[in-house]
Amino acid sequence: MSFKFNSGTFEDNTFNEQIRDRLTRALNPSRFENPESTSGQDGSDSQKKPKKLDILKSGVTVRQVDFRTIPQLEILDLDVSAQSKSLLKGICKISCKDAMIQITTEIEANLLLLYEAVSPEFTTPKLISNDSFTVPITMTFDHIELEAITNIFVKNTGVGISFNDVNLDFRFECSMKLLQTSIEKRLKNSMETIFKDVLPSVIFNMSQRWFTHGPELVEDPSLIATDSALSEVTPMTILDDSDLQDLSPATMLRLSTLISSRQSLALNPISSHTVATIPGCIERQNLRRFSSRIPSLNNYYAQEVGKHRPSKILPTRENSNSIIANKMASDFIQNSLPTEVLESGSYNIREIANIQQRIYERNNEENVIRRRRIRLGKRSKSVQDTAAKMHPVPESGSLHPIIQPSTTPAATVTPLLSPQPVVAKSPPESMTPNTLPEQSPYTSNIAIDKIPDLTLPQAQLQKDKVPMRLNLLEESYFKSDLKDLRNSLYSPMRNQRFYVQSEDGARPSLLDGKRFSFVGLANQQMKWGNDDLPPPYKAN
């Protein structure tokens, strides 16, 4: 046995408007609550309110309902009882294709609960916004295909229906693409509740006007909570561990990068006199980490307190935009030493003093720490006086400095003294540069009378009659062949000017065919006596 619906009912769009209105009332029972049905004789029923979702800022509104194809109904079984109260029982098969429903609502984005009233003023930064903000969201269910077996009970007061063997498929689109996968998964898990509670109540309320012509709305007692304790909103989990797997890793990486780039836990940007994007402000997502790093005794002894004190569960809030002044949370914000630490004697006086000093330094912004200055090139008067006593300055009339002999014992190692050239002698006549006019760039304009006479240190020591040990270099200094070579190489003079021998000129026959070499004197790491560089010897 089967029948068809009247096509005219679906063409004039009156049926769609009725379905849209009934779905809106079913999804928002608190907005369309009948005051007569909730008021009792003793007034106890007036406190019974339906459960309200904390995440929703406003109610759910059904904006559009469209049945593009006419639904089909097939009667599988029918039982009519002839009693004073007429009763009709039947089993039907309902099939619906290509339907569309669009709903809108607003969710509240207030993920942090701030205890600003109980936090110290000097450690609590200025918040840009402490209020919640609403985000509109639109959800569209398109291409809905439904096949279900229903049990129908028809009385003279209304129509009751129950769904069995439901097969549902639809395409879901959300205005917030980040939450689309998570919402779609939750909706598919909650479809059982929709077909067991929501749709039967909607159909029953619609049938009241058809059968009794009474008031359009009769609340189902099952939708009203019987316990007043249900009025308190329990905390909800927005995202489970299974939901995190459905989120896009690329999107989560972008969000984490954006959040980490905006975090700032330093106290310098919080001060009003420093340069910052928003002076004296901190972002709300950083407040919890900022408060946990504030130097206080409770933060330092938090682990010790947690061993003796049971975990405290903060009370939940009815609305997400309300702020609760929690007294239990204030115990952990105040700078006081816990009683558990005093009883166990596990405190440290130095740590307590350091924490108090850090709090004072952070609170006192006018305390400017002076930087340490280091001056180079100057010595104090005491150091200069001691240096003058140890090494007296010679008289201005003396041109040659006199080396003071040391009074160290004989066992000490004597310093190495470099051989110095004797008084410069005039070069032989054979080396006069009369035939070399092109070597004028290599000559010097220093006059002879301005050059001081060079005196050996050993000769000066002999005048003072101070015995001193000679090293190998000083012993070889007094040999005759080295004297002649040194006189010719150190200060050759031509026409009262210093002259540097060129490679083209004639070489003096001083060595007489003998080989003479120096090993290791040209190395920069070695030093020739007290001079930085060795004398200008040339390689053969």
UniProtKB/Swiss-Prot annotation:
It is a multi-pass membrane protein. It comes from the Eukaryota. GO terms for biological process: mitochondrial genome maintenance; mitochondrion-endoplasmic reticulum membrane tethering; phospholipid transport. Signal peptide: none annotated. Residues 1-208 form the SMP-LTD domain. It is found in: Mitochondrion outer membrane. One of its GO terms (cellular component) is ERMES complex. Residues 26-51, 379-399 are annotated as: Disordered. The keyword Disulfide bond does not apply. GO terms for molecular function: lipid binding. Keywords: Lipid transport, Lipid-binding, Membrane, Mitochondrion, Mitochondrion outer membrane, Transmembrane, Transmembrane beta strand, Transport. Component of the ERMES/MDM complex, which serves as a molecular tether to connect the endoplasmic reticulum (ER) and mitochondria. Components of this complex are involved in the control of mitochondrial shape and protein biogenesis, and function in nonvesicular lipid trafficking between the ER and mitochondria. MDM34 is required for the interaction of the ER-resident membrane protein MMM1 and the outer mitochondrial membrane-resident beta-barrel protein MDM10. Belongs to the MDM34 family. Component of the ER-mitochondria encounter structure (ERMES) or MDM complex, composed of MMM1, MDM10, MDM12 and MDM34. This is Mitochondrial distribution and morphology protein 34.
